[in-house]
Regions:
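Hydrophobic alpha-helical segments and their boundary regions
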Residues: 12, 23, 40-41, 51
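Surface loops and adjacent helix of pleckstrin homology
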Residues: 17, 30, 52
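A short, exposed loop/beta-hairpin motif centered on an aromatic-Gly-Thr core
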Residues: 32-46
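Short, charged, intrinsically disordered terminal tails
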Residues: 63-66
Length: 66
C-alpha cells in the first residue's frame, strides 16, 4: 500500500509492504530530500498500531494525504 502526503508543496511517500517468505511487514517513509525511514514489524497488529502512530505524527507535523 502506498500513500502520498503533501506539505507546503513538498511530497512524502509512505509505503507498507509484506515479505511473504519472512512474514515481516515493512514501513518505508521516503522524505522530500530522498532519505528513507524504514521500520519492520512481525505482526499485523503491530503494523496497524505503528502505522497509526506514524501517520498521526505526520499529520501533527502538518503533512496531509495528497
Amino acid at each position: 500500500m502506498i500513500w502520498f502526503f503533501d506539505k507546503d508543496g513538498e511530497k512524502l511517500r509512505y509505503e507498507i509492504s509484506h515479505n511473504r517468505s519472512s512474514g515481516h511487514y515493512k514501513v518505508v517513509i521516503t522524505h522530500p530530500d530522498g532519505s528513507e525511514s524504514v521500520e519492520e514489524v512481525d505482526e499485523p497488529t503491530e503494523l496497524i498500531q505503528r502505522s497509526v502512530e506514524l501517520m498521526n505524527s505526520l499529520r501533527g507535523d502538518g503533512w496531509r494525504v495528497a
